[in-house]
């Protein structure tokens, strides 16, 4: 990597420019404990010469102290960063690494295999385009393989690469490879995973990771890095699916008022008719500002159109009441607006979730108080069986009915990851205690929860005022 280091040091601007126009692919590695996830990533980084000299020197020292590969460099130590990870030889936290090839940029999420760290794996999978599921060639499909495959499918990852690892320990047997591939194919069909790819690898020795291996002449496919380089994950932005969660209102002077945020989906042009939700107010896009001095006199900062995931400022032709948490969409393609949602919830806190308790539900830029009205069923992610429960514990995944104190504009998660997902925040500790995906939004009148207006006493109003003035972090609403 010394030559690469010198190149960066001599021409940092050129190095950045070389990579800025490459498309980005995010992938995660998952599988059972000790299947070699961290070793695979370490090998990929090492063989693609993306390890800096100081990182390599540190890893060599740690390898002598904690390594399990004798005199050889323990590739897993290039990724496992926590002291407890190195000492125990396992992955606990989600480790992110960046590297690039001639064709593409990559962000890797190395996720833990242990069941007690399921919430960490969900975090890593939430932004991934591709999942690499490792299977030990000696053990085949295990319970944790089934669990991770379920989570990968639940989070909408459409491409799954099955890396059958430690093939060197079974003499690169084609029979073993075919047996495991067939078994996982049946599992993928059961879950509804559409795009699966199978590669025989040895992460420790580097076979079929970056370069083709001579020890598997019967395998005609691409090595792992070649497959990641050539995989098509692009999706053309659909103009009609425009979603723009408003992050904040920008008013730098009396002559300008714009609405800032990152486009979550679709494409917008100046002159488009838009609707602000949940208020339902309509107007047209006057200008789209994407850089530089934010004034309507500075035409160089304007663009005729913008698309996901660009961060822009939008101005409107009419004075419309828009605030943080609102969503701007095309008038011809409105998402459903409701306060009653069907969700899949992953509970991430040691304190159990009990229906009826109020939490803050953070979806995109909006934060709305809400609660779980009913748990439909909990999924046993090892057997895929549904269980009836009254509350959720750490790492539980369940189908629930969630009710909010006010309606929001929402999409199903399978349609839009950003506007169809949310986190659950404890209102007292401010801890993130859960994460979820919107499965359905109630449209039928009888399904929408009616939150009737309540008549408050003078004492209740006084208490409300006291809480708002002295505990603003509670974000208590005005009554």
From Swiss-Prot:
It is an enzyme of class 2 (transferase). Pathway: Sulfur metabolism; hydrogen sulfide biosynthesis; sulfite from sulfate: step 1/3. Residues 22-238 form the tr-type G domain. Residues 89-93 are annotated as: G2. InterPro entries: CysN_GTP-bd, CysN_II, CysN_NoDQ_III, G_TR_CS, GTP-eEF1A_C, P-loop_NTPase, SO4_adenylTrfase_lsu, T_Tr_GTP-bd_dom. One of its GO terms (biological process) is hydrogen sulfide biosynthetic process. GO terms for molecular function: ATP binding; GTP binding; GTPase activity; sulfate adenylyltransferase (ATP) activity. Pfam families: GTP-eEF1A_C, GTP_EFTU. Keywords: ATP-binding, GTP-binding, Nucleotide-binding, Nucleotidyltransferase, Transferase. With CysD forms the ATP sulfurylase (ATPS) that catalyzes the adenylation of sulfate producing adenosine 5'-phosphosulfate (APS) and diphosphate, the first enzymatic step in sulfur assimilation pathway. APS synthesis involves the formation of a high-energy phosphoric-sulfuric acid anhydride bond driven by GTP hydrolysis by CysN coupled to ATP hydrolysis by CysD. HAMAP family: Sulf_adenylyltr_sub1. Belongs to the TRAFAC class translation factor GTPase superfamily. Classic translation factor GTPase family. CysN/NodQ subfamily. This is Sulfate adenylyltransferase subunit 1. It comes from Sulfurovum sp. (strain NBC37-1). The lineage of its organism: Bacteria, Pseudomonadati, Campylobacterota, Epsilonproteobacteria, Campylobacterales. The gene is cysN.
């Amino acid at each position: 990597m010394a030559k690469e280091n010198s190149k960066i040091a001599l021409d940092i601007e050129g190095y950045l420019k070389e990579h800025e126009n490459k498309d980005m692919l995010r992938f995660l590695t998952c599988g059972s404990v000790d299947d070699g996830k961290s070793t695979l990533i370490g090998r990929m980084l090492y063989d693609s010469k993306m390890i800096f000299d100081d990182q390599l020197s540190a890893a060599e020292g740690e390898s002598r102290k904690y390594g399990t590969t004798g005199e050889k460099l323990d590739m897993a130590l290039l990724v496992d960063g926590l002291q407890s990870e190195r000492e125990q030889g396992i992955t606990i936290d989600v480790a992110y690494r960046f590297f690039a090839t001639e064709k593409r940029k990559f962000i890797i999420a190395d996720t833990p295999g242990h069941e007690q760290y399921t919430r960490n794996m969900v975090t890593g999978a939430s932004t991934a385009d591709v999942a690499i599921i490792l299977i030990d060639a000696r053990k085949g499909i295990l319970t944790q393989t089934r669990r991770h495959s379920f989570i990968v499918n639940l989070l909408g990852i459409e491409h799954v690469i099955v890396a059958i690892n430690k093939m060197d320990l079974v003499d690169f047997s084609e029979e073993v490879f075919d047996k495991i591939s067939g078994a996982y194919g049946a599992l993928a069909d059961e879950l509804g995973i559409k795009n699966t790819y199978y590669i025989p690898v040895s992460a420790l020795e580097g076979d079929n990771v970056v370069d083709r291996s001579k020890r598997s002449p019967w395998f005609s496919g691409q090595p792992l890095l070649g497959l990641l380089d050539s995989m098509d994950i692009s999706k053309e932005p659909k103009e009609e699916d425009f979603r723009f969660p408003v992050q904040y209102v920008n008013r730098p002077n009396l002559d300008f008022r714009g609405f800032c945020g990152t486009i979550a989906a679709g494409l917008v042009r100046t002159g488009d008719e838009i609707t602000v939700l949940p208020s339902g107010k309509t107007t047209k896009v006057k200008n789209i500002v994407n850089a530089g001095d934010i004034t309507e006199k500075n035409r160089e900062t304007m663009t005729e159109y913008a698309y996901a995931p660009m961060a822009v400022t939008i101005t409107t032709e009419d004075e419309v009441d828009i605030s943080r948490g609102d969503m701007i969409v095309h008038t011809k393609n409105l998402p459903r607006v409701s306060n009653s949602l069907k969700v899949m919830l992953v509970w991430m806190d040691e304190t159990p979730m009990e229906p009826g308790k109020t939490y803050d539900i953070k979806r995109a830029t909006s934060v709305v108080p809400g609660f779980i009205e009913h748990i439909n069923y909990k999924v046993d992610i090892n057997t895929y069986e549904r269980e009836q429960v009254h509350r959720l514990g750490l790492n539980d995944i369940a189908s629930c009915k969630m009710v909010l104190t006010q309606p929001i504009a929402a999409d199903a998660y399978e349609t839009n990851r950003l506007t169809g997902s949310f986190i659950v925040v404890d209102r007292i500790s401010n801890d993130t205690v859960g994460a979820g995906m919107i499965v359905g939004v109630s449209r039928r009148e009888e399904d929408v929860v009616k939150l009737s207006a309540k008549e408050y006493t003078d004492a209740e109003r006084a208490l409300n005022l006291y809480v708002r003035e002295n505990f603003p972090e509670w974000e208590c609403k005005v009554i």
